[in-house]
């Protein structure tokens, strides 16, 4: 289904800052420990130390997906001039499975925002088939849109995000 103006990805400016509008085509379930990520959920760095379990829907295990995890609010939400920071990149994930069955191109690096409340965005793309994806030379100033264009991934088929701030930070994101 197409995203409405009230969709949390639109309200949270994930669509716009990181992604172009897209239609959700498969389910994406992201779990840290026993907490399932819902759009806008607040998580602390201590809760996201280890990579999450990611489950992908779909009905044909011959379809493959690429998962990208980025922070668009680097170094701070008020001055994101290093947008985006790549935290994780997994390719060749078969439908109906999860990240454990994919190819980890860039290993998971847990979010540790230095200041402010950062959005951590997980984006799922459907691949045209198995393909070789090269790790970028650096994690800073990664661009999800350019990455999708280079590897002919098209628009996302699912996405989710959570908010993360310093362990002793306070307050919530204002939208």
Swiss-Prot record:
Keywords: Cytoplasm. It is found in: Cytoplasm. The keyword Repeat does not apply. One of its GO terms (cellular component) is cytoplasm. Pfam families: PBP (PF01161). InterPro entries: PEBP (IPR008914), PEBP-like_sf (IPR036610), PEBP_euk (IPR035810), Phosphatidylethanolamine-bd_CS (IPR001858). PROSITE patterns: PBP (PS01220). GO terms for biological process: meristem determinacy; positive regulation of flower development. Belongs to the phosphatidylethanolamine-binding protein family. This is Protein TWIN SISTER of FT. It comes from Arabidopsis thaliana. The lineage of its organism: Eukaryota, Viridiplantae, Streptophyta, Embryophyta, Tracheophyta.
């Amino acid at each position: 289904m197409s995203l409405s103006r009230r969709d949390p990805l639109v309200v949270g400016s994930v669509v716009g800052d990181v992604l172009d509008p897209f239609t959700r085509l498969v389910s994406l379930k992201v779990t840290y420990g026993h907490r399932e990520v819902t759009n806008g959920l607040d998580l602390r760095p201590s809760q996201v130390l280890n990579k999450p379990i990611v489950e992908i829907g779909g009905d044909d295990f011959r379809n493959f997906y690429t998962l990208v995890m980025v922070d668009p609010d680097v170094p701070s939400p008020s001055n994101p001039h290093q947008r985006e920071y790549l935290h994780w990149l997994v390719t060749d994930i078969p439908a109906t499975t999860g990240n454990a069955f994919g190819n980890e191109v860039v290993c998971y690096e847990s979010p540790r925002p230095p200041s402010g409340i950062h959005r951590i965005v997980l984006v799922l793309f459907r691949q045209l088939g198995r393909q070789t994806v090269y790790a970028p030379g650096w994690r800073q100033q990664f661009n999800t849109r350019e990455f999708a264009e280079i590897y002919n991934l098209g628009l996302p088929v699912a996405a989710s995000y959570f908010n993360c701030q310093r362990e002793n930070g306070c307050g919530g994101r204002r939208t």
